[in-house]
Amino acid sequence: MLKFSTTTTIEIKIAVSCDPALDMTPAEISAYLQGDFDSLKIKQDQAPTYFFIKPLSPADREEIEIKAGAYTRSELGRMIYLDQPDDQKTRAYWHDALSDQEKNAFAQYQSYLNRVYAETAKKALVRIEGFEGNAWDAIQSIKPDAHRILTIAEIVTHIQRISLLGDEGK
């Protein structure tokens, strides 16, 4: 039997791991990002910020990639990005050894990925519980910056999971 894309009319409620109202181990965070909503651990007498997201259709995802620059992104940068080491210290030395052309291509590709993340979040973020106004603008005002970046990354991770995995990913 064929599998069909998940409906884009549902809304999923998520929280992000950097929320101070949560108390989760790295293993619980990983499980939560993979769709195990039972791993969400909230501190007693606390309430996290909830974000409501919707799945994206294949057409939505293609539109996002094109808007972010899919046809003009650096293919050399993509190849270098895929080849980078996992270990942070090793990656630092590896990056330092790249030629200027390779560093530039790598930076261009990372910029493209950042645009994809931003466009994905803008398109699929429906609302933030208890917040009136533009949800994307609210995310841009999260401080410190590390929490803003992590919030966007986790929101996009959830969006990709529910958009690509169908019903079993929700």
Model-derived features: positions:
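Short, surface-exposed, charged amphipathic helix/loop patches that serve as local interaction elements
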Residues: 24-170
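Short, intrinsically disordered N-terminal pre-domain segments
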Residues: 1-17
